[in-house]
Amino acid sequence: HENKKPFDIVEMSYGEQVLWPNHCIQGSMGARFHPDLNHTRADVIIRKGSNPAVDSYSAFYENDKVTPTGLHGYLKNREVTKLTLVGLATDYCVAFSALDAEKLGYAVTVRLDMARGIDSDGSLNAALDKMSKAGVNLVNG
C-alpha cells in the first residue's frame, strides 16, 4: 500500500482494514511453530492469511466474511461443540475467531491468561466487551 504506514486504515473491497507491520510472513522464522510445540500429533493444521488480497483474523473465515478456512467443517465432522481459544492477539485474531465460533454454535471459552492483546486505542476492552455480550466465556486460569 503505497504511501501508507503500519496501523493506517485502508478501505478494501470487504471493508476497512488495518495495515499491520510485517509479521508471520510465509517461510519466515516468524511464521514457524514455536520449537517447544509438539505439532506432530495434530490431525490437521489450518492455515490462514495466505491470500495477499484479503487479510484473515478469524480461524473460521477470511476478513471478507465469506471465504472459509475449513476449520468449521473439520470440527463439525468430528462433532466438536466446545472450544477453548488462546493466543495472539486477544483483540483481533482471538476475538474474531471467538465471535465467529459463537455464531456457528460452539460453546466458546477464551483463556485470557494465555492470550495477549495489542490494545490499540482501547481495542482490547472493546473486544472483551463484544465477546462477553456475544456469550463467549472469558476466564483467567
Per-segment meaning from a language model:
Residues 1-82:
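Active-site alpha/beta core segments
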Residues 92-105:
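Histidine-anchored nucleotide/phosphate-binding helix
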Residues 48-49, 87-89:
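Short, well-ordered beta-to-alpha junction loops that form the rim of enzyme active sites
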Residues 84-87, 107-119:
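A short glycine-rich beta-strand->turn/loop micro-motif centered on a GG-aromatic cluster
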Residues 32-44, 119-141:
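Structural recognition of alpha->loop->beta junctions
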